[in-house]
Amino acid sequence: MSGEKKVISITASCYNEAENLSVFYERWRKVLEQYPAYDYEFVIADNCSTDGSRDILRRLAAEDPKFKVILNSANFGHIRSPYNAIMNASGDLVVSTCSDLQDPPEVFSELLKKYEEGCKVVCAVRSETNANVMMELFRRFYYWLLEKISPGEKVLSGFTGFGIYDRVCIEALKKFNDPYPYFRGMIAEIGFRTVTVPYVQEKRLHGKTKNNLFTLYDMAMTGVVHHTKLPLRLAVSFGVVLGVLSLLISLIYFILKIIWWDTFNLGVAPLVIGLFFFSSVQLLFIGVIGEYLGAVWTQVRNRPLVIEEERINFQGQGKE
């Protein structure tokens, strides 16, 4: 990298993005070339793609020595792989983005302007999206709920991770040593001065989204269990409230039966309804407890973020 220039690191992960990678590189390079005062690098992590993405990444790396590639040995998912790319960026400011180009590179100029004003964290927040209406409503509800139940710094609504992060922030993130990191929440937790820049999230350029109901649920629950103990305390509170309610209902039924012994018929329906209700509540909170136990299990195993098969253009930074 050249002498006194600050280095911008563009980081992303990909899985079967062969149709998007070349356009991703060209659009980002075109944007970066507008800032000759900065040098740049790309750090792209591939999750064991099967559609020829790796061949394209190798070609781009051969054409541009600043294009660094991490080839994972397996698909390590949408949480760990992009975070590993961020952790391996060497730039003075690190940009986290998506390889499907839903985060338009042209927004970078607004992000950089805020960064140069002295902000350590500049988050791009969606003002508009082309997502399904119902999905967007669910997302807004989730962020609203997470904001209400989180005791500390709040996760920004509409923030997907796209933004600029100063090197001091990256070094702070490395101290977490979290094998399953919730990046958006960690950015809120480190506490550096943060500003937001609204942007319109574009449609995926080519191909289909790799997110499904499971991956969205995984991300949502990871955010909850990493940032609040309220669901566990709700389980205790519900247990107490429902226990008291059960005693009161039992007492009322007993009194009514004493008063109208021959005419008051208890019936089967209240028993069945009560059984299903209490069983549902129990299963719900057993599931909540299971999520927290799963998070603890992930932590205590202390496994690496990813297993890397190969690195390209990381001279002096690991195996090539």
Task: Give a label for each model feature.
Residues 2-7, 182-320:
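Hydrophobic helical membrane-anchoring modules
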Residues 70-74, 78-88, 93, 105-183, ...:
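Acceptor/aglycone-binding surface of glycosyltransferases and processive sugar-polymer synthases
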Residues 62, 87, 113, 117, ...:
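Solvent-exposed polar/charged
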Residues 15-19, 102, 106, 174, ...:
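Residues in soluble alpha-helical coiled-coils and helical-bundle/repeat scaffolds
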Residues 18, 25, 105-108, 159, ...:
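Membrane-embedded alpha-helices of multi-pass transport/permease systems
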Residues 1-132:
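Structured catalytic core of nucleotide-sugar glycosyltransferases
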